Design a protein with these regions (language model features):
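Bacterial N-terminal signal peptides that target proteins for export
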Residues: 1-11
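Bacterial N-terminal signal peptides
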Residues: 10-18
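CBM-like carbohydrate-recognition segments
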Residues: 28-87, 96-115, 119-134, 140-156, ...
Length: 392
């Protein structure tokens, strides 16, 4: 039996929710403001940095992480937002500090969380995208158990659980949502010791999977509008970043889901099944294209989907879920290839802009979610460098 009292994180106060949520909500920024803050494309990004070493050694991995994180921090810290686009970046920056020992990345995230008073974006309480930033709030709470750090988030998640279900529409109707929300709910279960968060995410994950996952292909459609769409070669249309969101979401959910949870084995099986399929779709270059099943239709290697895949598989290696002998070469090849898209100033390019399907982009295209995925991947690869049998 799952004993959440043994598993939960000790909490000094049962949240004192009266201290948490603001009584007034600021106006939600316009979609254009949020979109424009997420990244840009440089027509003249300069030269690729050939000095970065692909060796899986602490010194080399951390140098690459710092190069990219420093550029991103200088480029976007002044325009941080609470939007989903930044959620992976904040997680990646926290991971970068933990990996490199440089506190400035962590401190930038903490400073912003304090600036917005640990709030979510207003106006869409049940939208998974707006819950994604909660993952960084939870991570910071686990460092210092100050109830205000998660009070607004907990109130929001409780409201989502209590809401009346719309039988005609899944709550998480697009596959990206499986990164945005489930890890947030799973971590709240860890913090509070309340299994209701796990049971809720389990129910909603099943509904999304029932409607979007194709067991024969071991991949997710982005949403229901893609069920009948095909590539030029006649294959089903499966978006790389969409499946990257899912695989990374599985890794992040499993990282906080207790071993004793009755449904955990289902998530492990799905994670391993998808990892096997995605590893087999890796291109000779080491990366993945935006469309997974028609390589002739999409010519460019893409970073964000590739980085999420790399992060998730490296996590699996480090946690004994994936066979290192099989997956380490996949991860090493991908890491080396991603370094080939870091420019001399630290810009990480070849990141597909915001979208919902395979699409075109330039080499200077850089967006915060792709940078966050790269930093998360680097943090797990750095752990690989410390494993027995790895070259240092």
């Amino acid at each position: 039996m799952l004993d959440l009292k043994k598993w939960m994180v000790a909490t000094p106060v049962v949240f004192a929710l009266s201290l948490g949520a603001q009584t007034t909500s600021p106006e939600r920024p316009s979609a254009k403001i949020l979109h424009d803050a997420a990244g840009d494309t440089s027509d003249n990004p300069g030269k690729i940095d050939t000095s970065l070493s692909p060796k899986i050694a602490h010194k080399d991995v951390r140098a690459a992480m710092k190069k990219v994180a420093d550029w991103e921090l200088g480029h976007s810290e002044a325009i941080f937002t609470q939007d989903w686009t930044y959620a992976p970046l904040y997680s990646g920056l926290l991971a970068a500090s933990a990996t490199t020992g440089d506190a400035k990345y962590h401190d930038a995230v903490l400073k912003y969380a304090e600036k917005v008073n640990w709030q979510l974006l207003p106006g869409r309480y049940d939208h998974a995208d707006d819950e994604a930033i909660g993952q960084s709030y939870e991570a910071l709470y686990l460092e210092k158990k100050d109830p205000k750090r998660i009070a607004a988030l907990k109130e929001n998640l409780d409201k989502v659980i209590a809401r009346e279900r719309d039988p005609k529409k899944d709550l998480w109707w697009w596959c990206d949502a499986l990164y945005m929300a489930p890890p947030t709910f799973a971590t709240m279960a860890k913090i509070t010791g309340d299994r209701k968060y796990l049971d809720f995410l389990d129910k909603e994950w099943d509904l999304t999977t029932e409607h979007l996952y194709v067991p024969a292909d071991k991949l997710y459609f982005r949403d229901a509008t893609f069920l009948q769409k095909t590539e030029a070669n006649g294959q089903k249309l499966f978006w790389s970043r969409g499946n990257g969101w899912v695989l990374a979401g599985l890794a992040r959910t499993l990282s906080v889901m207790p071993n004793e949870y009755p449904q955990r084995a289902k998530y492990v099986a799905l994670y391993k099944e998808m990892a096997d399929r995605i590893a087999g779709l890796q291109q000779p270059s080491g990366l993945w294209r935006t469309g997974l099943l028609d390589q002739t239709a999409y010519k460019e290697d893409e970073i964000s989907g590739s980085a999420f895949f790399t992060y998730a598989m490296a996590w699996g290696i480090n946690n004994g879920v994936l066979d290192a002998g099989k997956y380490r070469p996949v991860v090493e090849k991908s890491w080396k290839a991603m370094l080939g898209h870091v420019f001399e100033d630290g810009r990480l390019g070849s990141i597909q802009p915001i979208g919902a399907a395979p699409g075109a982009f330039g080499p200077g295209s850089s967006y915060v979610y792709g940078v966050g995925a790269f930093l998360l991947a680097g943090s797990e690869i750095d752990k690989m460098a410390g494993m027995k049998g790895m070259k240092r």
